Regions:
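ACP-dependent fatty acid/polyketide chain-elongation machinery
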Residues: 1-68, 246-256, 353-368, 411-414
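Conserved beta-ketoacyl condensing-enzyme motif
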Residues: 9, 24-26, 30-163, 192-203, ...
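Active-site-adjacent elements of ketosynthase-type condensing enzymes
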Residues: 44-54, 111-115, 194-221, 263-283, ...
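A glycine- and small-aliphatic-rich helix-loop capping segment at beta-alpha/alpha-beta transitions
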Residues: 23-30, 114-128, 178-181, 201-214, ...
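Condensing-enzyme catalytic core mediating Claisen C-C bond formation in acyl metabolism
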Residues: 6-10, 34-38, 215-292, 300-301
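Active-site-proximal alpha-helical scaffold in enzymes
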Residues: 79-92, 141-144, 149-193, 232-253, ...
Length: 414
């Protein structure tokens, strides 16, 4: 049997629609802050959906030089800022001696969509010679990883996962596995996304995936509510620093929590719709629990994928019930997307951070805008107000277009 390393979280960073650092994000989760408002990043007048969950008042100059920021897409800026926050928080130092044992993996479902759109406009109106030479490096989805590695000097395993809305969670899970197997000593990992653009909003609207509550946008993201009608697109990044328990103890680091399980599957069913009954998601949950050697009674909280779409919320509820049976009704299940909107490939990162904050501060974030119970969604969704609770083990679900399913298991450190 291989000698698996225990893997702990020693640093966290977040850029979100409800807070641009960990302290702000924690307060937002505890108070049920609503991050949804009218779109300001472009003129949405011609669009059927005119609202989103934007990152607001971000002081990027504290992390990125002004000259550099002009050469980085918005999603990469979010990823690097959150990575620097997490790295600084961890107290980890990268030297020539350890650089090749420290890696980066930041998932993104879409990558540099803003760059792609703006340069396509230049190509169309001004011709090919006016297209920026930075176009390709700005828009490719691995560049948040690349820029973070350059900024921090991390020369170890480097990757960018692109499994749609499961990308951030896959990046964390894959990083966990690398450290567990001894292939790396530490990983900076999570997700980043910035798709609140004309094409991004129009594309999801045409797919009937978005809510169109333009008259009351702050009530639009309502996971598990009977009157849910689509998700609210968000943006931002959540990043963790993972490292071996031995390494963290050796340098006397603060340890937030331990990552103990990872399950990932594919529905192989449909390009956008989940498999009936959420069977693929259920299998990912089952695999994470088995990987963690957990009994079902140990799970204290589930951070749901909870997108506020009819299909996801119903099928995710079914998936949870198929695994936990009668105990499903005793486990608090909440969707922080009710506050942050759906960050697509960035969602797994900020939701992993939410689980870690839940473990360390003993509370469960709410599902806000939960007003009308749905008979098909009949679990405890922690409606509208955060709840004090002793949380020892938390699960985080992420499901993506293409049938990608991920479940991560976190626990207090023993």
């Amino acid at each position: 049997m291989p000698n698996f390393h225990r893997v702990v979280i020693t640093g966290i960073g977040a850029v979100t629609p409800i807070g641009n650092n960990i302290d702000e994000y924690l307060v937002g989760l505890q108070t049920g802050t609503n991050g949804v408002s009218d779109i300001t990043l472009f003129d949405p007048e011609q669009h059927p959906c005119k609202f989103a969950a934007e990152v607001k008042n971000l002081q990027s100059e504290n992390f990125i030089e002004a000259k550099e920021s002009k050469r980085w897409d918005r999603f990469s800026q979010f990823g690097v800022i959150a990575a620097k926050q997490a790295f600084n928080d961890s107290g980890l130092e990268i030297t020539e001696a350890n650089a090749s044992r420290i890696g980066v993996s930041i998932g993104s479902g879409v990558g540099g969509l803003l760059t792609m759109e703006s340069q396509a406009q230049i190509l169309s109106h001004k011709g090919p010679k006016r297209v920026s030479p930075f176009t390709v490096p700005m828009m490719i989805p691995n560049m948040a990883t690349g820029l973070a590695a350059i900024a921090l000097g991390a020369k170890g395993p480097s990757s960018s996962v692109s499994t749609a809305c499961a990308a951030g969670s896959n990046a964390i899970g894959d990083s966990f596995r690398l450290i567990q197997l001894g292939k790396a000593d530490a990983m900076i990992c999570g997700g980043a996304e910035a798709s609140i653009t004309p094409l991004g909003v129009a594309g999801f609207a045409s797919a009937k995936a978005l809510s169109f509550r333009n008259d009351s946008p702050q009530t639009a993201s309502r996971p598990f509510d009977a009157e849910r009608d689509g998700f609210v697109i968000g943006e931002g990044s959540g990043i963790l620093v993972l490292e071996t328990l031995e390494n963290a103890q050796k340098r006397k680091s603060r340890i937030y929590a331990e990552i103990i399980g990872y399950g990932t599957t594919c529905d192989a069913h449909h390009i956008t719709a989940p498999s009936p009954g959420g069977v693929g998601g259920a299998e990912a949950i089952k695999l994470a629990i088995k990987d963690a050697s957990l009994s079902l009674e140990k799970v204290d909280y589930i951070n749901a994928h909870g997108t506020s779409t009819s299909a996801n919320d119903k099928n995710e509820t079914s998936a949870i019930k198929s695994i936990f049976r009668d105990r499903s009704y005793l486990i608090p299940v909440s969707s922080t997307k009710s506050m942050t909107g759906h960050l697509l490939g960035g969602s797994g990162g900020i939701e992993a951070v939410a689980c870690i904050l839940s473990l360390t501060h003993n509370f469960i974030p709410p599902t806000i805008n939960y007003v009308n119970p749905d008979p098909e969604c009949d679990l405890d969704y922690v409606p509208n107000n955060a709840r004090e609770a002793q949380v020892g083990v938390a699960l985080s679900n992420s499901f993506g277009f293409g049938g990608h399913n991920v479940c991560l298991a976190f626990s207090k450190i023993n």
